[in-house]
Amino acid sequence: MQYSRSVGRLIEELARLPGIGPKTAQRLAFHLVTAPREAAESLSRAILEARDKLVFCRVCANIADENPCGICRDQNRDHGLICVVERPRDVLAVEKAHGYRGLYHVLNGSLSPLQGVGPEELNIAALVTRVREGTVREVIVATNATVEGEATALYLARLLRPLNVRVTRLAFGLPVGSDLEYADGRTLARAIEGRREV
């Protein structure tokens, strides 16, 4: 179908977002161009504000409004427990489960030699530093149940075990090959409770 150049460009840009296919991009584009101007401006401001004001926490590497983030500063959380996740969106998935009260560490990916992602490209050195500080007693590896996630979990277990810290992995019940962010809260809470040694 032929669109005006502006609508076509908007559809292309929306379709570049994860999880947005061509049909959804088309629906969103037509909604935005037919909505009141204030709605489009409000969305535009929210996107720019998020890009300009959000930071990566210097402790855990999660996306935050402050540095360090609210989770790392919360004294009611268990600072001896660190849940390692691949992406910031995985922190949100674990938090929604309401069963975890420790801290986090975001790797910003997983090991994938075929795509050129090795330990140096991930936020692993900062995790080792946190564990070496001596206050961490357990690291829960909550990487995705994919080949890359499993490889990352095994690598972290071998790396951290000599540092006298317990290294556990989420229990299964999470579908193999799926991303953590798509798990429902109850399944994720059970996986945290049933975690196992790696």
UniProtKB/Swiss-Prot annotation:
Task: List the Gene3D superfamilies.
Answer: 3.30.60.80, 3.40.1360.10, 6.10.250.240, RecR Domain 1
Q: Which SMART domains match?
A: HhH1 (SM00278), TOPRIM (SM00493)
Tell me the Gene Ontology biological-process terms attached to this UniProt entry. DNA recombination; DNA repair
- Zinc finger annotations (C4-type) as residue ranges: 57-72
- InterPro entries recorded for this chain? DNA_Rcmb_RecR, Hlx-hairpin-Hlx_DNA-bd_motif, Rcmb_RecR, Rcmb_RecR_Znf, TOPRIM_dom, TOPRIM_RecR
Pfam families on file: RecR_C (PF21175), RecR_HhH (PF21176), RecR_ZnF (PF02132), Toprim_4 (PF13662)
Q: Which GO terms describe its molecular function?
A: DNA binding; zinc ion binding
Keywords of the record, alphabetical order, are: DNA damage, DNA recombination, DNA repair, Metal-binding, Zinc, Zinc-finger
Q: Which intervals hold domain Toprim?
A: 80-175
In terms of NCBIfam families, this protein maps to:
recR
**Cited function:** May play a role in DNA repair. It seems to be involved in an RecBC-independent recombinational process of DNA repair. It may act with RecF and RecO.
Family note: Belongs to the RecR family.
Q: What is this protein identified as?
A: Recombination protein RecR
Naturally occurring in which organism (per UniProt): Desulforudis audaxviator (strain MP104C)
